[in-house]
Each structure stands twice: as C-alpha cells, then as structure tokens.
Amino acid sequence: MTLEILYQDPYLIAVNKPAGMLVHRSWLDRHETQFVMQTLRDQIGQHVYPIHRLDRPTSGVLLFALSSEVANLLCLQFENKQVQKSYLAIVRGYLVGEGRIDYPLKVQLDKIADKFAQDDKAPQEAVTDYLGLAKVEMPYCVKKYPTTRYSLVRLIPHTGRKHQLRRHMKHLFHPILGDTQYGDLHQNRALTTHTGVQRLMLHAERLIFTHPITQQQITICAGVDQQWLDLINIFDWDLNSIH
C-alpha cells in the first residue's frame, strides 16, 4: 500500500495513518505484517523516527522525524505540552456546546508487557476539551429505544494518557462509536447493521507545532476516510461547514 503524505521537508514527514494499521512492530501483535513505519520507510527510501503514536483503530495525522536529532527535539515539544492536537469523533447521544473534562485516569497496564509493573499508582491528570459540532437522530432501534442519537464532536487533549479520549467519552456516557473496548457493543452492532460502518470513529484531524529547525509554526491537517464520509453522508452532515 501507499501512505498519503501530508507534509514533507528535509527534516520531517507526516502521513495520514489508516485506521487499523499499527504504527510499528509489536511482539504483542506478531501476526501483523503491515506497519506505518516500515511502509513509509520503504515508500520514501529513508529511515523514519517516531515522534508520537496513534492507537491502532485511530486514523489521522502521524508525524515522523527524518533524523534522531530532530526526533529528540520534537519529542521534547510533546513532553512539554507545546503541541496542539485536535480530533474528530462521532459519539452516542447528544453532546452539544463546549466544555472541559478534567478527570484523572488510572495507568493502564498491559497484562503481558507490564505484568511485573506496579498496579497501585495514583490516577494521572487527564484533561480534554470538547466542542459539539453536529447532531442527528436516526431510526435505529437499540434495545428498548426506537431511535438513536449521535453527535459529531471535536476533542482537544491537553494531556496524553493511554486511550484518553476514548476513556473520557465513556466517562461522559457518550462513548465513541465503534469502540470495542470502551464503547457500547449494542450501539456498535446497530451502527454496522444500518450503515456498514465498523471502525472506531476517532480521527486525528490536526497537529500544530513549532518546526524544530526553522522555528516556524506548522499546521498539518488530515482528511477523513471513506467510512467517515459514508457516515457523514448518511447523517446528512456538512463537513465543509465545520471549522
């Protein structure tokens, strides 16, 4: 496959990560054969250095450095919360207006990779801003309810905890559609039955940072994939009017 390159200069490269693709090799997913890092390296004929990551089911802007020195400089910006990130998500229920979720999250340990790690750490600070963009009610019967409500929201994380956006939406009782770990399985099944969509509806739409060499502000945006476009069309939302 060929990855969509969103930005490239002598120091950096950014791609639109497809949903379902791992960023790099992991011994926890030994059966996988396609990874963003290896695919991009082969595509441009040059080694790339990861700066941050996106969960496997999440799509959108993914940034790499083209040298270890630039990678270290960019990683510092992420660590110091100098990078602005925004995501689009479709969630269950009506989530309107804007607000801030300030809800600490307990460190999540992997049963295999972290089996010797301490499981008694205090919850870590986790902050997410949200903005309701659009809503719709559809005649999809779920359990005893004859219709289902959905919202398109923009999510802006100010911290980077594991699965932060997915866990914060669950905390608000507005789980992200297609989330098999934190979402509503009945809602996910109904959505797939009526629309054919069966991915996590979470997309990293924008990344803003300071170029570590030129010191210019860089804004990188990623368009949504076909499943997103299909669902937006079914819900009769106008993505072009959303800024």
Curated annotation (Swiss-Prot):
Which reactions is this enzyme annotated as catalysing? uridine(65) in tRNA = pseudouridine(65) in tRNA
Give UniProt keywords alphabetically: Isomerase, tRNA processing
- Organism domain of life: Bacteria
Give the matching Gene3D superfamilies.
Answer: Pseudouridine synthase (3.30.2350.10)
Query: Which SUPFAM superfamilies does UniProt cross-reference here?
Result: Pseudouridine synthase (SSF55120)
Q: What is its EC number?
A: 5.4.99.26
List the molecular function annotations (GO) for this entry: RNA binding; tRNA pseudouridine(65) synthase activity
Kindly list the biological process annotations in GO that this record carries: enzyme-directed rRNA pseudouridine synthesis; tRNA processing
Q: Which residues form the active site?
A: D55
Q: To which protein family does this belong?
A: Belongs to the pseudouridine synthase RluA family.
Q: What does this protein do?
A: Responsible for synthesis of pseudouridine from uracil-65 in transfer RNAs.
Q: What PANTHER family does this protein map onto?
A: MITOCHONDRIAL RNA PSEUDOURIDINE SYNTHASE (PTHR21600), TRNA PSEUDOURIDINE SYNTHASE C (PTHR21600:SF56)
Q: What is this protein called?
A: tRNA pseudouridine synthase C
What organism does this protein naturally occur in?
Answer: Pasteurella multocida (strain Pm70)
Its ancestry begins with:
Bacteria, Pseudomonadati, Pseudomonadota, Gammaproteobacteria, Pasteurellales
